[in-house]
Amino acid sequence: MSETVHNRIAVLRAERGISRRQLADALGVHYQTIGYLERGEFRPSLHLALRIAAYFEVPVEVVFSIEPFPRIGGAAVENRRSA
Protein backbone atom coordinates (compact mmCIF):
# COMPACT_ATOMS: atom_id res chain seq x y z
CA MET A 1 0.00 0.00 0.00
CA SER A 2 1.61 3.23 -1.15
CA GLU A 3 -0.06 6.18 0.52
CA THR A 4 1.11 9.72 0.09
CA VAL A 5 2.17 11.53 3.24
CA HIS A 6 1.33 15.22 2.95
CA ASN A 7 3.28 17.73 5.00
CA ARG A 8 3.57 21.40 5.88
CA ILE A 9 7.32 21.52 6.36
CA ALA A 10 7.85 24.24 3.75
CA VAL A 11 5.06 26.37 5.25
CA LEU A 12 6.44 26.00 8.77
CA ARG A 13 9.96 26.82 7.57
CA ALA A 14 8.75 29.91 5.70
CA GLU A 15 6.74 31.16 8.68
CA ARG A 16 9.85 30.93 10.84
CA GLY A 17 12.43 32.06 8.28
CA ILE A 18 14.35 28.77 8.45
CA SER A 19 16.32 27.44 5.48
CA ARG A 20 16.34 23.79 4.44
CA ARG A 21 19.97 23.60 5.50
CA GLN A 22 19.24 25.05 8.96
CA LEU A 23 16.45 22.54 9.51
CA ALA A 24 18.57 19.68 8.21
CA ASP A 25 21.47 20.62 10.48
CA ALA A 26 19.16 20.78 13.50
CA LEU A 27 17.74 17.34 12.68
CA GLY A 28 21.05 15.73 11.70
CA VAL A 29 19.97 14.91 8.14
CA HIS A 30 21.23 16.00 4.71
CA TYR A 31 19.64 19.23 3.45
CA GLN A 32 18.40 17.42 0.33
CA THR A 33 16.35 15.14 2.58
CA ILE A 34 14.30 18.17 3.60
CA GLY A 35 13.62 18.96 -0.06
CA TYR A 36 12.61 15.35 -0.75
CA LEU A 37 10.24 15.46 2.22
CA GLU A 38 8.70 18.78 1.17
CA ARG A 39 8.07 17.52 -2.37
CA GLY A 40 6.60 14.22 -1.14
CA GLU A 41 9.42 12.21 -2.72
CA PHE A 42 10.40 10.66 0.62
CA ARG A 43 8.27 9.45 3.51
CA PRO A 44 9.86 10.10 6.89
CA SER A 45 10.32 7.44 9.51
CA LEU A 46 8.16 7.86 12.58
CA HIS A 47 11.26 8.94 14.50
CA LEU A 48 12.12 11.67 11.97
CA ALA A 49 8.49 12.85 11.79
CA LEU A 50 8.38 13.22 15.57
CA ARG A 51 11.72 15.07 15.59
CA ILE A 52 10.47 17.49 12.92
CA ALA A 53 7.29 18.17 14.91
CA ALA A 54 9.34 18.67 18.08
CA TYR A 55 11.66 21.09 16.27
CA PHE A 56 8.68 23.25 15.26
CA GLU A 57 7.07 22.73 18.69
CA VAL A 58 3.78 21.51 17.21
CA PRO A 59 1.91 18.19 17.30
CA VAL A 60 2.98 15.77 14.57
CA GLU A 61 -0.48 15.99 12.94
CA VAL A 62 0.11 19.71 12.33
CA VAL A 63 3.09 18.77 10.15
CA PHE A 64 2.02 15.46 8.57
CA SER A 65 -1.24 13.97 7.30
CA ILE A 66 -2.40 11.18 4.99
CA GLU A 67 -5.11 13.59 3.78
CA PRO A 68 -4.20 16.70 1.77
CA PHE A 69 -4.10 19.86 3.84
CA PRO A 70 -6.63 22.54 2.85
CA ARG A 71 -5.10 25.28 0.75
CA ILE A 72 -4.38 28.42 2.72
CA GLY A 73 -6.83 31.08 1.62
CA GLY A 74 -8.77 28.57 -0.48
CA ALA A 75 -12.04 29.07 1.40
CA ALA A 76 -11.68 32.85 1.26
CA VAL A 77 -11.18 32.74 -2.51
CA GLU A 78 -14.22 30.48 -2.95
CA ASN A 79 -16.36 32.76 -0.76
CA ARG A 80 -15.38 35.79 -2.86
CA ARG A 81 -16.24 33.96 -6.08
CA SER A 82 -19.65 32.96 -4.71
CA ALA A 83 -20.53 36.53 -3.67
Go through the PLM ranges and name each one.
Residues 47-62:
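DNA major-groove recognition helix of helix-turn-helix/homeodomain DNA-binding modules
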Residues 9, 23-24, 34-37, 63:
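Conserved hydrophobic/aromatic packing and binding residues within compact polymer-binding modules
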Residues 54, 64-83:
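Short, charged recognition helix plus adjacent turn
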Residues 1-15:
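A short, Lys/Arg-rich alpha-helix, primarily the initiator
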Residues 29-42:
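Recognition helix of helix-turn-helix/homeodomain-like DNA-binding domains
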Residues 14, 25, 54:
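Alpha-helical residues within the helix-turn-helix
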